[in-house]
Structure formats: C-alpha cells, structure tokens
Amino acid sequence: MRTNPTTSNPEVSIREKKNLGRIAQIIGPVLDVAFPPGKMPNIYNALVVKGRDTLGQEINVTCEVQQLLGNNRVRAVAMSATEGLKRGMDVVDMGNPLSVPVGGATLGRIFNVLGEPVDNLGPVDTRTTSPIHKSAPAFIELDTKLSIFETGIKVVDLLAPYRRGGKIGLFGGAGVGKTVLIMELINNIAKAHGGVSVFGGVGERTREGNDLYMEMKESGVINEQNLAESKVALVYGQMNEPPGARMRVGLTALTMAEYFRDVNEQDVLLFIDNIFRFVQAGSEVSALLGRMPSAVGYQPTLSTEMGTLQERITSTKKGSITSIQAVYVPADDLTDPAPATTFAHLDATTVLSRGLAAKGIYPAVDPLDSTSTMLQPRIVGEEHYETAQQVKQTLQRYKELQDIIAILGLDELSEEDRLTVARARKIERFLSQPFFVAEVFTGSPGKYVGLAETIRGFNLILSGEFDSLPEQAFYLVGNIDEATAKATNLEMESKLKK
C-alpha cells in the first residue's frame, strides 16, 4: 500500500500543507478537482468541500483521492451524498488520509466512516486519532501461536473451531441467520471472555444496525450509564450510503481494532457484516472511476483490495485481532469471485445451509461443509478430533442414505444403517441450540455450552447410550443433561394424553 509522506511527519504544520482546489466535474459520488500546478494532493488524501447549497443549507462533504488524472486534476470519491455541490466550489486538501478517533473513548459509541459519532451522545472524548490507511504489520512482528477460541456454540466448537487471532468466514445466502449468529458471538465473547469487540456494519440494513445497538444495550454489552465499561465500538456504513463510505468503513473499524491490539495490547474481536458489501462497493467505485471490469463484472483490483484489508487483520506479539466476517454468497454460488477471493484468507469457514434453516435447525451451520484448519489432533487433542470425525462420518453416511430412504423407505435399510440414521438425526438436532439474542423469538432461554460438555454429549450419542430416547428431545437444548430431562418431560406428556 502507498504510504503518505504527510502522515509520517506530524511536526509539519497541517495548515501549511493545505492546498485549495476547485470542483471541475461531478458524476454522482465521483468528483474531479482541479488544483494549482505543483500543489497536487497524494493518493488517499482527504479532500473537504465546504459551502452552502442553493437553499442556504450548509454543505460538508469529505472525499478521498483515488486517481491523479493529469492536467492538474484529481479524481476523488465522496464519503457522503453529493447533492448540492456545484462546479467551481472550493475544495481543501487536508494533506493526510482520513483519520478516525481511537482508544477507550470509542467503546459504546456508534461512528460513521469518517469517525464522527452518529448516536447523538455528543463528541468523542479523545484526542488520539489514527489514519485508516496503513501497512500490515512487519513479518517479524507476527505471532504464530495456535490456540482455540471457545464460542459456547456446540456446532462451531466441535466441528469447525475458531482460531484465536484467526479469520473466520460466515457463508450463507439471504435470510439463513448470519447476522443473528454474529450477534450471538458478540454476546458470548463479551460475557465469557470479557474481550473488546469492534463491529463494522458494511453495507447492511440500517434496521439491523439499530436492532443490534438496542440489543447490546439491553444485554449490557453497551453500558449506557458508564460507556467506558462497554465492550464494543460500532462503525456503520449502511446500504443507503454512497459506495465510497461502504468501501472504507471496514478500514475505519479495523483502524480502531488495531489501536486496541497495538497500543492497549489487548485481544480484540473484529466483526465485519458483510465483507461481500465491501467488494460490492469496490466494484461500484471501480466502475465510476472508469476501470475495465473483470470476471462477473467485479473490479480488476479485487484480490489486491481484499488482501490489503485482510493482511492487516492479524496477531502480533502485542495482541491479537480475531476477525469474524459474514460473507453473503450471491445466489448461493460459492464459486462467485467475491466469496472465492475471501476463502483464500480464512482459517475457518462456517457455512450456513438453507436446507437446515428450512428444517428449523438453528444455528443452520452445515456440519459437513464447514471447515477449520484448527481441527487437528495436535491442536485440539485426540478426544475432540475423534469425536468430530465420528460425528462427520455418521452425518455423511446419513446423507448418502437419504436417496435410498426417499425411494424405498427406512424399512429397506440394514439394521446397522437404520441405527446410523437414528443417531445421525439425533446428532443433527443436538447441533441446534437456543441463542441468547433470539430469546424474544424462540421463547427459550439462551445456552452457552462449554467445549468439554459438547464433546461429552456427542460421545454419549455416538456410543448408543441414548438410542432409546426420542429425537425431538435433542432439539434446541444446551448440554446433554437437558436433552435427557426433555425426554422425560415428553414421555410424561405423552402418558397424560393417553
């Protein structure tokens, strides 16, 4: 990535560095700005347009330089709406890239892409700011320790465990529960690990952003009485905002997370919902800048843009950033260039299945499609590894038998296969779990299940200890003891009906 000479020398007065230009052309969110000869801004510099529109309303639009065109002109992308701008308006070169507030004062607050608070709680009490464009940490600074990050979600911890300081992708089409799973992870991690999180809402629904904020206040993740005790900072650049804002909001969130890692030396969680919208915004900006599109209409710089963001999300010897990224899969096609490029950067993938969601099994995590580089005996231990492999083998055999069952029925299967199917159906249901953040919808209190409990439960099902219990006893419960209690209740209810 290019570095800006102006950012490395804070002693130079920014006032001296400010150059004045004029708007020469406006095409939607893209501005061409003419500067005096020899006063051209650098790539990624922030430009600010101030003035009044025809109705006398104040205008304050920040842009980012993307191209130097020649003839003393630059092309910049606006971070907010360009309504009211006119040719000839003055444009100030700030001499630096966009800088956003960082540190403890950001916790409990909502920011836009420019680092401005948008929660009506007044200014942010910090003088510390950081530019959103930086190089990734040097190779020698990186930390390579391998350890599991327990989430309290059975299907994740058992079959596709997350790496502390790793990158995890949540893959799924529209409406299969990506955002609910992210909200549950924020809730569990804040309560169980006491970690600090940064949430980047990239191009998603404003309503979901508002719901998330309200639920965080209710659950105590954001402490309204004492914001300093909050566990999360929120950065939103939602669907209705210009592509420039959606393209850069991920970097704003990442910059805040980097400060907690590098200066406060903390372990941080960075949530990005949705990384596909980052690619989509980049595609829009690329088209507006006149670049030739690549495969499926995406920008030719897709891999570079993704790599620039992802390589900064890493663990150093000071602290770690564990990143969980929702990845919208267009038309459920995993070979689309956007999800395919994202795959290359991930340590674990949690794939959400429409088939499981249709069955009512939530979280709708596909146990066979989800993967993790952490599921190795030397990392997770022999017992965990063996249990996970047996669960996968049982579910795989059930999947193979489904066609035979659909055509001939269960009675045509061998005794051994019928037992496999019965256990697989119990496992499938036991992989479901009531969520804390979904209590209002399900009416069931949320459950956090430790890894040891999860392994014990699945071992008991695989050993045949619960072959006599009905499969509905395993649906939406926490640990295995709750399943046995539910089976007893179901038996009593059926006796009463008789």
From Swiss-Prot:
The modification Phosphothreonine is found at T6. Keywords: ATP synthesis, ATP-binding, CF(1), Chloroplast, Hydrogen ion transport, Ion transport, Membrane, Nucleotide-binding, Phosphoprotein, Plastid, Thylakoid, Translocase, Transport. GO terms for cellular component: chloroplast; chloroplast stroma; chloroplast thylakoid; chloroplast thylakoid membrane; plant-type cell wall; plastid; plastoglobule; proton-transporting ATP synthase complex. Disulfide bonds: none annotated. It is a peripheral membrane protein. It holds the Pfam family ATP-synt_ab. ATP binds at G172, G173, A174, G175, V176, G177, K178, T179. The modification Phosphoserine is found at S13. It catalyses: ATP + H2O + 4 H(+)(in) = ADP + phosphate + 5 H(+)(out). It is found in: Plastid, Chloroplast thylakoid membrane. This is ATP synthase subunit beta, chloroplastic.
